[in-house]
């Protein structure tokens, strides 16, 4: 019970609060106008209701008089018939009277005891059941002594309002009963009842409509232009120079609008010029930043990323990551974060007076406030080993007093480090290779020069052969360097028919004696239908010599070296491979190549010998092979397993009576 009472109370309080808040949002002028409109509308609606209601009451009075007159007329005519008990004539007369008078709804005759003996338009059965009919019509109790004047009343039925007229039936001073007549109300009176409501509501609404229309007209003619001007001024102040006022007004207000639009147009042109200049400068900067080979990042003083160029995204695998706005230290690899956290935080803390120099500590520099970048070299292990160089530089404002951010440039110097290491190794190898033959040559020549007369002919000849051998070794080293230089240049080589039988025979012939000395088995497996290949004989001979020489170098005594050559069948070829290919393979049962060396074995200066502790060769042989095969529009491949052996193979196009020149 308490809940049912409190809920309406709470709802009422909520509505009151809402109305109070809604009313408080209007200004004083609007409140006064609304109050005045409400008073006038209520006053006019009340006057209208009173006037129309008076008309309705007059119409009801007319209906009452009409019903009484009709009842008296009918009673005067039927009373003699009832006195004579001529009910047939009563029925005939009453029916004719009922049919000719449209306003009569029913006619009922009752005797002095109140029993109904005739009624129109009721059936005989209904009339006989006078109790039912009496209840339906609601006949009054009849008192003959006090009932000498017509009695009029109105009551409501499901079919509408009815005016009931009860007339006493008297003849020659004798009370014969009661005549009840139901009169339909005047349609004008019924309509006037609805008209009262409609006109009252219409007057109330019309007053509010006129007031609202007046307010709208006032807003459109005066208030709206002022609001538009106010909004335009706010937009101009906010930097929106595209704001225009398009209201069609003349006079002083129209002139004010025109002047405002001209001012906005001039400001927009000025802004467009500035934006165009800024956009051009920004485009230049974006182009420069996006095209430089180094990675570049800009962070604010909170170390939040503001700009990252494509190179930096690629270096740190940020291509598909929304990195702008993220914290730099949270997204760098752990190795970089460990070294840069402290320096970045010191720079971000506005160490404005510090000049950082690579390899030196901070130095005071108050005169020109220029800042040298601090350099870091960091080795990464994920996702693959590499070395990067990072440089941190402060970004100051125009007066070079306040810190605005930090620029970090990133360089992937992995290749540079590898080349430096390879060159250092190469120089070491070449120095050793050059020093040994030169020392030997010098030693033997000095011996011959000083003790030549004391040496036998055989000894002098042996010394000269050794010096000659060392000279060949020195020439071979120099030739390797020169060959690689030529291959990497744009020199043009002519390709023609190459007899692979002859090429392989000549390559193996030069190693026959060495194979015997080292107890190695040399074997060739050549297809009997081996076609001529398209290539350069001298270059391919150098390829075979280098590959077979490598197999000799890394194959132990008792091992085997096999050279195969065979045409590839059509089922092994793709449509883009051309008319046909010949495959050449050099296999050995040597020590094999470790998988981590296989990816870099064709690089310049790379030497597997470093891992097996044999400082023979220059590290250029396989690089020369790779370049020569590339000149033949092909690639060198290898398959190797440590402790099992290695197979190098490449494909050559079949010669088709054509002459090609390649560069």
From Swiss-Prot:
Task: Tell me the ranges covered by the HAMP domain, including all copies.
Answer: 220-272
Locate the Phosphohistidine modifications and list their residues.
432
Q: Does the keyword Transmembrane helix apply?
A: yes
Catalysed transformations (reactions): ATP + protein L-histidine = ADP + protein N-phospho-L-histidine
Return the Pfam families for the record.
Answer: HAMP (PF00672), HATPase_c (PF02518), HisKA (PF00512), PAS (PF00989)
Q: How does it sit in the membrane?
A: Multi-pass membrane protein
Keyword Glycosyltransferase tagged: no
Report TM segments: 32-52, 165-185, 199-219
The record's Gene Ontology biological-process terms are: regulation of DNA-templated transcription; response to herbicide
Location comes to: Cell membrane
This protein's GO CC annotations? plasma membrane
Judged by the first EC level, this protein's enzyme class is transferase
Q: Which SUPFAM superfamilies match?
A: ATPase domain of HSP90 chaperone/DNA topoisomerase II/histidine kinase, HAMP domain-like, Homodimeric domain of signal transducing histidine kinase, PYP-like sensor domain (PAS domain)
Q: Where is the PAS domain?
A: 281-351
One GO term in the molecular function aspect is: phosphorelay sensor kinase activity
PROSITE patterns, per this entry?
A: HAMP, HIS_KIN, PAS
Name the UniProt key words of this record, in alphabetical order.
ATP-binding, Cell membrane, Herbicide resistance, Kinase, Membrane, Nucleotide-binding, Phosphoprotein, Transferase, Transmembrane, Transmembrane helix, Two-component regulatory system
Q: What else is known?
A: Mutations in dspA results in resistance to herbicides difunon, diuron and calmodulin antagonists chlorpromazine and trifluoperazine.
The record, for PANTHER family, names:
SENSOR HISTIDINE KINASE GLRK, TWO-COMPONENT HISTIDINE KINASE
This protein's name:
Drug sensory protein A
Name the encoding gene, please: dspA
């Amino acid at each position: 019970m308490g809940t049912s009472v409190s809920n309406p109370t709470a709802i009422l309080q909520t509505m009151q609060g809402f109305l109070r808040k809604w009313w408080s949002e209007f200004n004083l002028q609007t409140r006064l106008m609304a109050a005045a409109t409400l008073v006038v509308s209520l006053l006019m609606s009340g006057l209208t209701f009173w006037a129309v209601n008076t008309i309705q009451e007059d119409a009801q009075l007319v209906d009452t008089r009409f019903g009484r007159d009709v009842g008296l007329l009918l009673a005067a005519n039927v009373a003699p018939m009832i006195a004579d008990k001529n009910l047939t004539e009563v029925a005939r007369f009453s029916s004719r009277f009922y049919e000719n008078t449209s306003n009569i709804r029913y006619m009922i005759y009752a005797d002095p005891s109140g029993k109904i003996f005739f009624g129109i338009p009721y059936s005989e059965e209904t009339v006989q059941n006078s109790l039912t009919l009496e209840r339906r019509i609601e006949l009054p109790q009849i008192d003959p002594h006090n009932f000498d004047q017509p009695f009029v009343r109105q009551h409501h039925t499901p079919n509408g309002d009815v005016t009931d007229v009860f007339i006493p039936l008297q003849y020659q001073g004798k009370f014969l009963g009661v005549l009840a007549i139901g009169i339909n109300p005047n349609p004008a009176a019924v309509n006037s009842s609805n008209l009262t409501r409609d006109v009252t509501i219409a007057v109330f609404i019309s007053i509010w409509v006129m007031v609202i229309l007046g307010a709208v007209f006032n807003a459109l003619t005066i208030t709206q232009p002022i609001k538009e001007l106010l909004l335009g001024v706010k937009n101009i102040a906010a930097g929106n120079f595209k704001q225009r006022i398009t209201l069609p007004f003349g006079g002083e207000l129209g002139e004010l609008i025109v002047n405002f639009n001209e001012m906005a147009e001039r400001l927009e042109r000025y802004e467009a010029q500035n934006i165009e200049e800024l956009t051009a400068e920004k485009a230049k900067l974006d182009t420069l930043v996006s095209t430089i080979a180094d990675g570049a990042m800009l962070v604010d003083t909170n170390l939040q990323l503001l700009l990252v160029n494509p190179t930096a995204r690629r270096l740190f695998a940020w291509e598909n990551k929304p990195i702008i706005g993220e914290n730099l230290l949270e997204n760098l690899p752990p190795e970089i974060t460990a070294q840069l956290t402290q320096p970045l935080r010191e720079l971000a803390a506005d160490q404005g007076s510090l000049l950082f120099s690579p390899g030196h500590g901070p130095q005071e520099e108050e005169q020109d406030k220029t800042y040298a970048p601090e350099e870091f070299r960091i080795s990464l292990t994920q996702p693959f080993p590499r070395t990067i160089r990072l440089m941190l530089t402060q970004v100051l404002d125009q007066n070079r007093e306040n810190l605005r951010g930090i620029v970090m440039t990133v360089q992937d110097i992995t290749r540079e480090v590898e080349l430096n290491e390879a060159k250092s190794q190469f120089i070491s190898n070449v120095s050793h290779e050059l020093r040994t033959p030169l020392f030997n040559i010098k030693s033997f020549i000095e011996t011959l020069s000083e003790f030549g007369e004391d040496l036998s002919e055989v000894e002098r000849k042996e010394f000269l052969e050794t010096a000659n051998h060392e000279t060949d070794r020195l020439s071979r080293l120099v030739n390797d360097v020169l060959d690689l230089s030529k291959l990497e240049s744009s020199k043009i080589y002519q390709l023609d028919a190459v007899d692979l039988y002859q090429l392989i025979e000549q390559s193996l012939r030069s190693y026959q004696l060495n194979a015997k000395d080292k107890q190695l088995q040399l074997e060739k497996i050549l297809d009997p239908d081996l076609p001529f290949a398209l290539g350069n004989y001298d270059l391919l001979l150098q390829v075979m010599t280098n590959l077979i020489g490598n197999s000799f170098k890394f194959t132990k005594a008792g091992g085997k070296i096999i050279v195969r050559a065979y045409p590839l069948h059509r089922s092994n070829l793709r449509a883009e491979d051309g008319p046909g290919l010949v495959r050449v393979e050099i296999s050995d049962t040597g020590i094999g190549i470790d998988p981590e060396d296989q990816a870099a074995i064709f690089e310049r200066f790379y030497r597997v010998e470093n891992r097996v502790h044999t400082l023979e060769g220059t590290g250029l042989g396989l690089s020369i092979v790779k370049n020569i095969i590339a000149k033949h529009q092909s690639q060198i491949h290898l398959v190797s397993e440590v402790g099992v052996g290695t197979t190098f193979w490449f494909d050559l196009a079949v010669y088709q009576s054509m002459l090609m020149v390649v560069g």
